[in-house]
Amino acid sequence: MSLNVAIIDDHPLVLEGLKSLLIQTEGIENICTAQSGLQLNDLMTLHSFHLYIIDLDLPDIDGFELIHQIKQKSPEAKIIISTMHEEIWIVNKLKHPDIDAVVFKSSAGEYIQKALQTVLKGKKYYCPQFQKLYKEKDKIGHTPDTL
């Protein structure tokens, strides 16, 4: 299967790093990058993507809103979140049916590869630090759970 992938992050270094990791992945045909929701919308008029790697903090749109927009246009698309946010209330929001994988930016590059492989098999993936925080969230108290 040849995949089209979109990476959305407002930091060029992160975009380049993720792209260089994905180039090594068999089956990926096309990788496009965007630094904003607007740039992604422009790309989506030219390409259809199977997989999106999304940062939650973008200059022009909330990452959760962007996920909603993508899923409305492409319900079958896979979503991997790449975020620096490890706050409990965000961790809770990330456990959502529309999100297929979560990899913290503090994680090693191997975890984005594991996320990609797992998601393409139709399963969910959460990096080890996410799993740890998610298990601990109930000890800390109630957190918002809506997207």
Regions found by a protein language model. Give the residues of each.
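Conserved acidic segment of CheY-like receiver
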Residues: 2-14, 18-22, 52
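Active-site residues of response regulator receiver
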Residues: 9, 55-56, 83
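Short hydrophobic/Thr-rich beta-strand motif most characteristic of the beta2 strand and flanking loop
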Residues: 27-35, 43
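Acidic catalytic/metal-coordinating carboxylates
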Residues: 36, 62-65
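The feature encodes the CheY-like receiver
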Residues: 59
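Short amphipathic alpha-helix used as the core "switch/output" element in two-component signaling
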Residues: 64-75, 92, 96
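A short, hydrophobic beta-strand element within the central beta-sheet of small alpha/beta folds
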Residues: 76-86
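Short, flexible helix-to-coil linker/hinge segments that flank and couple to helix-turn-helix
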Residues: 89-95, 99-100, 104-147
